[in-house]
């Protein structure tokens, strides 16, 4: 299977969830073996240089997965666009933006899916590399845990836990095996969520300034405040899976393995990636010259190119 990039550049505007700033974002094709990179067009000189994404650049995970370089350049809330790039198997792309944060759009990855559909996807000449998990790797901290285990495909199982009436009405656990289920159908529409009291607290600290009922599920003491309700009965845990897929794709390759988590979040997801990369016996980078040898979870990627 070959690496892929966008067929053309494409742009969108939106608002940063935490900054409230208007953001212009453009996705560009990129050369093979270049990976996913970001560039802040509002910064000059070294501060405006291209940033090659790696797990070691995620240095702020308080409210999202945020790049913070050694020069102090920030690119925040990258997990939703990374999740969409993962769904399309995009290996190489340059993402330019004129603000410190990726726009939140509607709080899901669906607008970025539409953006990628409009741009189109093309195969390149180099072979796509996959990160294959060879042995279990687990991180536990403060009552939370995440782990990778070997698996011939890509499967995600997450459980959330909130002591709140809204969450008691839906299953706290969701599992998706991408050999038989579609990311676009099952995950892409799930929106970020937050509690009304947290929104008020964040705004007091100049955070969450761009959040509203059009780009997040907002919950009060008893109910969802969004008049349209939920997009899935278990939208909350599905969004956590959306986030996790984006966080994991920061490693730069599709993952062949199973990911499980209990009360997972950006910090612990990133810690798991770093733990895997720190143990050379835990993974291998593999290629599939013959697409028939691909695990079933990745066969759908073959139909998402425009030649």
Swiss-Prot record:
InterPro entries: Ribosomal_Su5_D2-typ_SF, UDP-acyl_GlcNac_deAcase, UDP-acyl_GlcNac_deAcase_C, UDP-acyl_N-AcGlcN_deAcase_N. SUPFAM superfamilies: Ribosomal protein S5 domain 2-like. Its cofactor is Zn(2+). The active site is at 266 (proton donor). It is an enzyme of class 3 (hydrolase). Zn(2+) binds at residues 80, 239, 243. Transmembrane segments: none annotated. Its EC number is 3.5.1.108. Pfam families: LpxC. GO terms for biological process: lipid A biosynthetic process. It catalyses: a UDP-3-O-[(3R)-3-hydroxyacyl]-N-acetyl-alpha-D-glucosamine + H2O = a UDP-3-O-[(3R)-3-hydroxyacyl]-alpha-D-glucosamine + acetate. One of its GO terms (cellular component) is membrane. GO terms for molecular function: metal ion binding; UDP-3-O-acyl-N-acetylglucosamine deacetylase activity. Pathway: Glycolipid biosynthesis; lipid IV(A) biosynthesis; lipid IV(A) from (3R)-3-hydroxytetradecanoyl-[acyl-carrier-protein] and UDP-N-acetyl-alpha-D-glucosamine: step 2/6. Keywords: Hydrolase, Lipid A biosynthesis, Lipid biosynthesis, Lipid metabolism, Metal-binding, Zinc. Catalyzes the hydrolysis of UDP-3-O-myristoyl-N-acetylglucosamine to form UDP-3-O-myristoylglucosamine and acetate, the committed step in lipid A biosynthesis. Belongs to the LpxC family. HAMAP family: LpxC. This is UDP-3-O-acyl-N-acetylglucosamine deacetylase.
